[in-house]
Design a protein with these regions (language model features):
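Iron-sulfur-associated redox domains of electron-transfer enzymes in respiratory
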Residues: 1-173
């Protein structure tokens, strides 16, 4: 969210950046002093749906203005548990095929706490740790409108389409 917002603000300094997603925790993230000037608003899918309903807008009746192909398939997979670490692992293997990548990805706050305690105790040295607060990842956030398995499938299809349609490969080359 923050990296994208900063990129937008760099190209368009007067832009208002709105993060729209299933994650209510992004609201807290956007309030951090280091983020406030980058992300102007955060709304969940549920909130956006309510806004559309209040205004009598049916998004399905609005014609698409085109597709965005400025993100990699790997980046679009971040919302599903394991997606962040998978993207990093794939990128490392692209540049350094012989490097072993130790990954621990966990879902849910209890599991995140456990793996962080293990890391603090030195039992996960050298590991890339991905912790998703919501079981299933961001697609299972409090502001999600559809069943989590459906959301995962949709994200996976977007990843597949992005990889296929993107002008560059997954690593920006």
């Amino acid at each position: 969210m923050v990296a994208t917002a900063r990129s937008i603000k760099k190209e368009h300094p007067n832009a208002k950046v709105v993060f729209i997603g299933p994650c209510a925790a992004k609201k807290l993230e956007a309030m951090r002093k280091t983020v406030r000037s980058d992300v102007d608003f955060v709304i969940t899918f549920e909130e956006l749906d309510a806004m559309f309903e209040a205004r009598g807008i049916d998004p399905k009746t609005i014609e698409s203005q085109g597709h965005l192909h400025d993100a990699t398939g790997a980046g679009r997979g971040y919302a599903v548990a394991g997606g962040v670490s998978q993207a990093i692992e794939n990128c490392i293997h692209e540049y350094y095929p012989d490097v072993e990548v130790l990954i621990e990805h966990v879902e849910g706050l209890d599991e995140c706490k456990k793996v962080l305690m293990l890391a603090k105790a030195g039992r996960k040295n050298g590991y890339l740790i991905e912790g998703m607060g919501c079981p299933g990842g961001c697609v299972a956030g409090a502001g999600t409108l559809i069943p989590v398995p459906n959301a995962k499938k949709e994200v996976q299809q977007i990843v597949k389409d992005s990889t296929k349609n993107c002008l560059r490969n997954n690593y920006g080359r």
